[in-house]
């Protein structure tokens, strides 16, 4: 028979272990694992969500949709939310990596509140992905363009007069000494060469890959990069580069916040008619462990005021009409004004400049416009894994 004292010790240890396991379980239940792009969320909003729901949000970063896919497919980490672009949502769905969204848990979501461009992108996605609306919630959207140094004499004229692409790849059309950068994501790089040839980036064959490779090998780029390209142009180390329009705007906002007047900004962006249009979306992986918390986070981020505040930091355009209207009409979130838009930090012209930027670079289509957004949405239709491998190896 066990000694009573020893028995009590055993019971105490068992109780202690149970408590530790219970606490650990609670902690795990309150941690949201988010896979996101770099510099792509308002961190003040994340902290606010953590406080409101007594949880923690752990953010991992990947630099491309392809990395998103490999991380979700591997299942090494059970992410609760991911923010891939349209074509990658389709691929993840086709591979059985996503679970449907429970829209009954998203009272802040109203499909009628989507901007015309966002609606059109979903409609285009549905041509090859019928269940798109059931698996994604729009996060941010935009285009790609050619950011350039306004102080480089003759550069702006050359870009505009040649619809961007001819000047971008034929450097004889550029002012002497122009330093050009290329966005280092194979799918996007391939698309630029197809736009240059007036071909669709969604057609991939051995012949088009050969054409793309020939163009790239015959074009001298001073730098290949991603997020750093915008900073290189702003600092004068590059003159021209292909990038997200949102990256350009992010750098613009930084300059404005640092006290530079809008008319004194040294760079601008040209958005060709034939370019990439995209929409990044909140999706829930099939292996997510904190599905209810993921829905709470989605609902929190798409709230009108929060979508507005998120767009103010990352530079990309909100897909929600009500939030967009707040921006272009200079409205503020009154109770959060001092937290997010301290006048001493941002300057008195911040809201006016933000409104100008949205209307200039993300203009709403007119009711009579047949095309609701500028650009081409990338698709996975007719593109095999071997094609994607060839594109990757080409770069």
Language-model features, listed with the residues they occupy:
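Extracytoplasmic ligand-binding site segments that recognize negatively charged/polar headgroups
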Residues: 85-87, 91-237, 251
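Loop/turn elements at helix/coil->beta-strand transitions in domains of secreted/extracellular proteins
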Residues: 53-55, 77-80, 175-180, 236-239, ...
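N-terminal secretory signal peptides that target proteins for export/translocation
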Residues: 1-5
């Amino acid at each position: 028979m066990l000694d009573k004292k020893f028995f009590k010790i055993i019971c105490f240890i068992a109780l202690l272990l149970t408590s530790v396991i219970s606490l650990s379980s609670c902690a795990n239940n309150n941690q949201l694992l988010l896979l996101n792009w770099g510099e792509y969320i308002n961190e003040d909003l994340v902290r606010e969500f953590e406080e409101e729901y007594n949880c923690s949000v752990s953010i991992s970063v990947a630099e491309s949709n392809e990395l998103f896919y490999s991380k979700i497919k591997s299942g090494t980490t059970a992410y609760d939310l991911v923010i891939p672009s349209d074509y990658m949502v389709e691929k993840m769905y086709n591979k059985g990596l996503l679970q449907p969204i429970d829209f009954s848990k998203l009272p802040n979501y109203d499909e009628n509140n989507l901007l015309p461009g966002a609606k059109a992108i979903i409609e285009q996605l549905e041509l090859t992905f019928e269940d798109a609306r059931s698996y994604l919630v729009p996060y941010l959207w935009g285009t790609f363009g050619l950011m350039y140094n306004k102080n480089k004499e003759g550069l702006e004229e050359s870009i505009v007069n040649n619809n961007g692409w001819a000047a971008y790849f034929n450097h004889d059309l550029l002012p002497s000494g122009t330093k050009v950068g290329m966005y280092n994501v194979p799918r996007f790089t391939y698309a630029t060469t197809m736009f240059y040839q007036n071909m669709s980036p969604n057609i991939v064959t051995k012949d088009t890959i050969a054409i793309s490779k020939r163009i790239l090998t015959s074009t001298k780029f001073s730098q290949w990069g991603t997020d750093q390209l915008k900073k290189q142009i702003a600092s004068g180390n590059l003159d021209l580069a292909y990038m997200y329009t949102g990256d350009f705007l992010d750098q613009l906002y930084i300059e404005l916040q640092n006290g530079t007047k809008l008319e004194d900004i040294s760079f601008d962006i040209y958005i060709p008619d034939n370019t990439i249009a995209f929409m990044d979306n909140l999706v829930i992986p099939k292996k997510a462990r904190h599905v209810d918390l993921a829905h709470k986070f989605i609902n929190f981020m798409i709230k009108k005021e929060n979508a507005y505040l998120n767009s103010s930091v990352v530079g990309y355009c909100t897909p929600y009409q009500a939030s967009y209207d707040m921006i272009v009409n200079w409205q503020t979130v009154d109770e959060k004004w001092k937290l997010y838009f301290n006048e001493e930090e941002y300057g008195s012209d911040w809201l006016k400049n933000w409104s100008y930027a949205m209307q200039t670079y993300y203009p709403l289509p007119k009711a009579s416009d047949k095309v609701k957004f500028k650009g081409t949405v990338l698709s996975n239709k007719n593109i095999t894994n071997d094609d994607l491998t060839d594109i990757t190896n080409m770069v």
